[in-house]
Amino acid sequence: MDHNGLHGFYHWMRVLQNGRQLAKAENANIKVVELFSLLHDTQRRNENYDPEHGMRAAQFARTLRGSWFDVTDTEMELLSEALIHHSEGYTDGDVTVRVCWDADRLDLGRVGIEPKPDKLCTVSARDPNILFWANARARYKA
């Protein structure tokens, strides 16, 4: 996959910014949110349909644990859940997992899709100011 493409490095950095903002507002586990942001699309095989990329990302994260980053068992479970299900449209779950999913969804503007508040998981992500901020960055790929 092209790491400069739609699911590449710049997307990961915007998801990281979104995640940090939401994690602070929602009192989520920032370490898990940051790891999710940087890992969630690393195992994509293409820019289009790749339903197993979340599972591969979770498996990849497990191989990095202990050498590239340290997390508790609980944090690893949260990270794995967020990675595995991030493309499925779920809105329920632990606040940290929901923040991860919203951080990614707030960057849909990069592909011309404006995030719909009713498809977001957290109150903070549905805030009109956050939606505007994230969507503007996504559309202009800033």
Language-model region placement:
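Short, well-structured alpha-helical segments
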Residues: 9, 13-16, 34, 73-84
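Divalent metal-dependent phosphate-bond-processing catalytic cores, especially two-metal-ion Mg2+/Mn2+ enzymes
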Residues: 1-28, 39, 67, 85-142
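His-Asp-centered metal-binding catalytic motifs of divalent-metal-dependent phosphohydrolases/nucleases
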Residues: 30-48, 53, 57, 80-87, ...
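Short, amphipathic alpha-helical segments
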Residues: 51, 55, 73, 77, ...
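Short gly/ser-rich anion-binding loops that grip negatively charged ligand groups
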Residues: 5, 47-51, 69
